[in-house]
Amino acid sequence: MGRTNTSDQLNAISDKNTKRKSLALDNEYHNNSSSEDDSSKIELSYTIPDNNNIISQETTTSVEDVLSLSSAPQNELRLRKQKSNNQDSPVDLNGVIVDVSKREKIFLKRKRQIDNKHGSDKSKYLSRFNDITFKAKSSTIFESDEFYKTDFFGMYVLFWLATAFAMVNNLIHTYFENSTPILQWTVVKVFKRDLFKVGLVDLAMYLSTYFAFFVQYACKNGYLSWKKVGWWLQAAFDGLFLFFWLWIASEYCLDFPWIAKVFLVLHSLVFIMKMHSYAFYNGYLWSIYKEGLYSEKYLDKLTNGKVTLPKGHTKNETEKVLQESIAFTKYELEYQSHATTENPDDHHVFDIDQTDKSIAKLQQEGLIKFPQNITLFNYFEYSMFPTLVYTLNFPRTKRIRWSYVFGKTFGIFGLIFLMILIAENNLYPIVLRCEIARKLPVSERIPQYFFLLMDMIPPFLMVYLFTFFLIWDAILNAIAELSKFADRDFYGPWWSCTDFSEFANQWNRCVHKFLLRHVYHSSISAFDVNKQSAAIITFLLSSLVHELVMYVIFGTLRGYLLLFQMSQIPLIIMSRSKFMKDKKVLGNIICWFGFISGPSIICTLYLVF
C-alpha cells in the first residue's frame, strides 16, 4: 500500500473518532429529533478509502508511509491531512477543525446530560441507526386487549354496524333498481381490465428489485466497492426503476387503466423505499466493517513493530486512535446485529471486553451478523416483510395463525367490494357531472364546483376510511402474519391527533419510519441543516411524491395536492402556538375538518379545473 493511501486511512480513522464523540453527545437520533444546536449535526457514515488490498499489504511500512501525528485540544490524536491524488479519500481535516471548535461548548454542555443518562463509561456510543426499534407486538390498536377494555369500544362496533346497514341499503337498491349485472358495472370493468397483465408486470417489477441484493452481493465478494461504484449504481437504478415502470403502465406502452396505474406507481414507490433502505443500510455497515478490519490489521503491525513512526510521536498516541476505532466499529456492528430484539436496549450495553476479540471471532460467536446477512434468502424474507426499513434482526412470531389470515383475507375482499359499490353508485355519477362542468365557462363552473364538492364529501369520506382499513389494517396484517413478522406497528391513533404533523406520524407508520431515517435524519447529516429545515425537506419530498400519484390518476399536472400538503406547515406552526397549547378539542376538530373535506376538495379540483 502506498504512502498516500496509508496516510488517508489513518487520517480518516482519526477524523471519524472525533466526529463520533461529537455525535454521541449532540445527535441522539433515538429521540426522533436533533439537538438544540442543529448547526452542529454531523454524519457518522464517513467511510475510509475502499481498498481490497488493505489486509494483504506488505508487512513493513517506511517512515514516509505513516502520517505525522499531533495532539488535539481534547488530548485526542489528530492527523494532518496531506495532499493526495486519491479521489476516494473522505477526509477534510480543515472542516473537522472547524466542526470541533463549534462543538466544544456543546460538548461540555451535554457531557453531564449524557453521563447521567448512560453512565460515565467511555465505551458508550450512539449508533447512527438507533432511531427505529422493531418490537414484537402481534396485535394492532383495534385488536389489543386494552382497546376491548375501553369504554369507547362500543363506538367502534357502532361504526361498523352503521356501515353495514348503509351498505346493505345501497346494495338492495342497486340490485332491484339497477338492471346492470355487477360484473358489467363501469368501475368493475375498469378494475378487471388487463388484470392478468398487471399481475405479470407487478411480478417483473418485484423481481427487478433484486438488483439491490446483487449489488451488495458483489460488494461482499469483492467485485465492486460500495463507496466507489455501488451507491452510484443503486441511486441511478432507483430513479430508473420508478420512471421505467411508470412508462410501462402509461398510454405510451401498455396503456393500463387508471386503477392499475395507481396500483403500480404506489407499489413501485414501496419497492424503491425497500431497495434504498436495504442498500444504504448495508452500505453504511460496509464502511464500518472495512474500517474495523483495517484498524485491527494496522494495530497488529504497530504492536509488533512492523510500522515505524515519525520522530517526536509516540506509539501510544497511534494505538489510542486505532483502539478507539476498533471499539466503535465492533460496538456498531454488534449493536446493529442485536438492537431489534424483543426487549431492545436503545443504547445496547457494549461489553468493553469484546474489543479484545477480533471481528472474525465475534462473527463466529454470532455477535456480529454482518456481512453474513447478505444472502438471497435474507433479501427474499425482507422483501416479504411489511416494512420499508431494513435491519439485521427483525422480531418474528413462532407460528402462523391461519384463522387470523382467513379473517383478514375476508376483510380485504369485503372492503374492496364495499369500495366498488360506493364508487359505482355514488362517486361515478359525480365524476360524470364533473366532466360536464369542466366544459363550462369559468364563471359557471365555479358555482357548480361547490355543489359537486358537497355531494362528493360523504362517499369520498367512506372510501377514505375504507382505504385505511383495507391497506393498513387488513392487507399489512395479513402479510405480516403470513411472513411471521411480529411488529404490527402499521398505524397509530391518527383519529385523535391535534395537528397534522402528528397525523403524518400516525397515519402511515411504515412510510414515517422510512422518511424519519432516510430523509429527515439524512438531511440533517448530509446537508448540515437544522431540524426545521429537515422537516420541510421531508414534507416537500412527500408532497412531490403525492403530486406524482395525482398526475398518474388524472393525467394533468396542477399542483393542487402539493399546495394543500405544504399549506399544512403553517397549520402545524399555529397548532404549536400558545393560543392552541391547551385546546386539544379544537385541534382535533381542525384535523377532522381537513380529513373530511380535504380529499374531496382536491379530487374535485382536479376533475373540474
Swiss-Prot record:
Taxonomy of origin reads: Eukaryota, Fungi, Dikarya, Ascomycota, Saccharomycotina
In its keyword annotation, does this UniProt entry include Transferase? yes
Family designation: Belongs to the membrane-bound acyltransferase family. Sterol o-acyltransferase subfamily.
Q: Where is the composition biased (Polar residues)?
A: 1-15
Report the transmembrane regions from the record: 152-172, 195-215, 229-249, 253-273, 402-422, 451-471, 534-554, 589-609
Q: Which GO terms describe its cellular component?
A: endoplasmic reticulum membrane
Q: Could you tell me what this protein is called?
A: Sterol O-acyltransferase 2
Region: Disordered; residue ranges are 1-41
Q: How does it sit in the membrane?
A: Multi-pass membrane protein
Principal subcellular localization: endoplasmic reticulum
Q: Where is this motif: FYXDWWN motif?
A: 490-496
Protein purpose = Sterol O-acyltransferase that catalyzes the formation of stery esters.
Origin species: Candida albicans (Yeast)
PANTHER family documented for this protein:
STEROL O-ACYLTRANSFERASE, STEROL O-ACYLTRANSFERASE 1-RELATED
Q: Which InterPro entries match?
A: MBOAT_fam, Oat_ACAT_DAG_ARE
What's any GO biological process attached to this entry? ergosterol metabolic process
The active site annotation covers: H546
Q: Where in the cell is it found?
A: Endoplasmic reticulum membrane
